[in-house]
Amino acid sequence: MTTRYIFVTGGVVSSLGKGIAAASLAAILEARGLNVTIMKLDPYINVDPGTMSPTQHGEVFVTEDGAETDLDLGHYERFIRTKMNRRNNFTTGRIYEEVLRKERRGDYLGATIQVIPHITNAIKEKVIAGGEGHDVAIVEIGGTVGDIESLPFLESIRQLGVELGRDRTLFMHLTLVPFLGAAGEVKTKPTQHSVKELRSIGIAPDVLICRGDRAIPANERAKISLFCNVEERAVISLKDVDSIYKIPALLRSQGLDDLVVKRFGLECREADLSEWENVIYQEANPNGEVVIGMVGKYIELPDAYKSVNEALKHAGLKNRVSVSIKYIDSQTVEAKGDEVLQGLDGILVPGGFGERGVEGKILAAKYARENELPYFGICLGMQVALIEFARNVAGMTDAHSTEFNKATPFPVVGLITEWVDEEGNVEQRHEASDLGGTMRLGAQLCHLLEGSKAAQAYKGNTCVERHRHRYEVNNKYRERLEQAGLVFSGLSSDRKLVEMIELKDHPWFVAGQFHPEFTSTPRDGHPLFEGFVAAASAHQKRDLKK
């Protein structure tokens, strides 16, 4: 199969939405019957985002094969059916690490290792490998044109443009076209300078995606075409919209997919965007609203919980309600108690690391349990629910996780001491082990208890979900917790590890050690999130009857 490559760059400012634009184009091409994948090339020196602060970088998205990747890969999976893997995201740090490892082995036969050709060749090899087996591979370059960090990546795709030729490569550049209220018009000069910067390193854009808070007038598009040497039909206006799921249709209406298909000489059907039209209709026509309290520690940056936010919205679509997310700092719960949890239709405690705010999450789980409020715990959210139950129902006062209190008399949650690395090797872990790459990661089979809420949600006795954690339920206390009434509704493939818990005599109190948000999509939703939002809606109706 001959793969065509679309390289997506950004200019003027960061956060223009390259990932959304790339994913939206991929969605249209997929709707035309093409097999599409998307890659993200990140210019930072970290080997992966696994140890980066969520409040700086946003969430870490985990792929099925256990790669810790940029949150943009979450957008990719929500827009197209293709599942991402570790080949879809790599960083400057990863490239340098691999090149230096080869140098130490002597693979370069004593050559002087340089950015060109050794680093650029390594980048090109990864891009080609990531695109294999697909009709089209869209490659997003992180950062902004002009950044020092991005230069090796830009040089690499410039070389690929020459080596593969125009019939297999296309360069798409996102820029900002701001509107100045004082002048009463949009300004194209930033775009002109951004394209000039891109052309100075040897890349001539074939398509310009012009971002702004309004549509770009036809005369300004003609001006951009003239000064940037891009044909007018390839100057695409991408205005702000109230839903990112409207963007595929917006790009389709301007013929972007036709331009791509013609450029690559591909024969395929017209795009069928009916699934996206249905998503947009559901989003615009809810029959009610539920308020979900998300109790976490990274709430100052909602992108830290990006996939959870989106999964709740998807569940709202399936239940025909809009979901309003109330972000609650778990430390505020510690300071003010139950009062900050009033007026909610459900509580969700997402994943996280570290001791700060953990008692607030435990209090949130207790409030939900005692007040029959729907509760959904994810990863740490499951662990705090189990700790709360152990303390206040099972009689294990001061029960805790060894992550937060190594001297706890009841370590109901403990460190996983053995794991398999990305190369399949069994490694031993201890408290002093590296933080990066030393977690239980990726898709794992889970056996579900027949008759449980989990089994009802999944409509079966098994599920496969993605993990990212280094602490697990301590099996030593399983029997005592079960005797106190806790239901272990999900177990690992070997039935040795607890994957899900729930409460029997509660309207909906379900928690999982995995991260179901990573597999939720706007078209398909996710069974656990759908069940949670349905329970929240039912709770609201019960409250209204009282």
UniProtKB/Swiss-Prot annotation:
Task: Indicate yes or no for the key word Ubl conjugation.
Answer: no
Q: Could you tell me what this protein does?
A: Catalyzes the ATP-dependent amination of UTP to CTP with either L-glutamine or ammonia as the source of nitrogen. Regulates intracellular CTP levels through interactions with the four ribonucleotide triphosphates.
Q: Which PANTHER family does UniProt cross-reference here?
A: CTP SYNTHASE, CTP SYNTHASE-RELATED
Query: What HAMAP family has UniProt attached to this entry?
Result: PyrG
Q: Which residues bind CTP?
A: 14, 147-149, 187-192, 223
Under the heading Pfam families, the entry gives:
CTP_synth_N (PF06418), GATase (PF00117)
Q: Does the keyword Ion transport apply?
A: no
UniProt lists the family membership as follows: Belongs to the CTP synthase family.
Annotated Mg(2+) binding sites: 72, 140
Q: Which residues bind UTP?
A: 14, 187-192, 223
Q: Where does L-glutamine bind?
A: 352, 380-383, 403, 470
How is the subunit organization of this protein annotated in UniProt?
Homotetramer.
What Gene3D superfamilies does the record tag this protein with?
Answer: 3.40.50.880, P-loop containing nucleotide triphosphate hydrolases (3.40.50.300)
Official protein name in the record: CTP synthase
Recorded GO MF terms = ATP binding; CTP synthase activity; glutaminase activity; identical protein binding; metal ion binding
Question: Which segments carry the region annotation Amidoligase domain?
Answer: 1-266
Q: Which domain of life is it from?
A: Bacteria
- Where does the Glutamine amidotransferase type-1 domain start and stop, copy by copy? 291-542
GO biological process entries: 'de novo' CTP biosynthetic process; pyrimidine nucleobase biosynthetic process
List the catalysed reactions.
Answer: UTP + L-glutamine + ATP + H2O = CTP + L-glutamate + ADP + phosphate + 2 H(+); L-glutamine + H2O = L-glutamate + NH4(+); UTP + NH4(+) + ATP = CTP + ADP + phosphate + 2 H(+)
Task: Report further notes.
Answer: CTPSs have evolved a hybrid strategy for distinguishing between UTP and CTP. The overlapping regions of the product feedback inhibitory and substrate sites recognize a common feature in both compounds, the triphosphate moiety. To differentiate isosteric substrate and product pyrimidine rings, an additional pocket far from the expected kinase/ligase catalytic site, specifically recognizes the cytosine and ribose portions of the product inhibitor.
